[in-house]
């Protein structure tokens, strides 16, 4: 698979398949952030969730590299950067 194909696949997953399975990506990451914050007794942002999910995928790559991990990391990176874009427009 070429770089563009990986990125296209990640974009399709983030905007299509996963959104259908799990609902709106922003709401999902906000829900995860609330749960992790309550469990850890430490404030976690939705942006933090996306970064931590990339780290989870990186840990899995250490065991066995798969295309899916790289594609998922690209998807989480896109979500993470979209949070920085959203924050820029809030100020």
Predicted features along the sequence, with ranges:
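Long, charged low-complexity segments
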Residues: 1-40
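Compositionally biased, intrinsically disordered low-complexity segments
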Residues: 16-17, 54, 82-84
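Short, contiguous, well-structured surface segments enriched in hydrophobic/aromatic residues
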Residues: 25-63
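Short, compact, well-ordered microdomains
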Residues: 64-83
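Conserved small/polar residues in nucleotide/adenosyl-binding loops
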Residues: 84-91
């Amino acid at each position: 698979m070429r770089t563009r194909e990986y990125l296209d696949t990640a974009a399709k997953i983030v905007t299509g398949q996963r959104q259908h399975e799990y609902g709106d990506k922003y709401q999902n990451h906000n829900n995860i952030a609330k749960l992790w914050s309550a469990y850890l007794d430490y404030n976690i942002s939705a942006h933090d969730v996306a970064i931590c999910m990339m780290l989870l995928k990186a840990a899995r790559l250490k065991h066995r590299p798969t295309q899916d991990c790289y594609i998922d990391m690209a998807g989480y990176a896109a979500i993470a950067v979209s949070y920085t874009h959203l924050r820029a427009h809030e100020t």
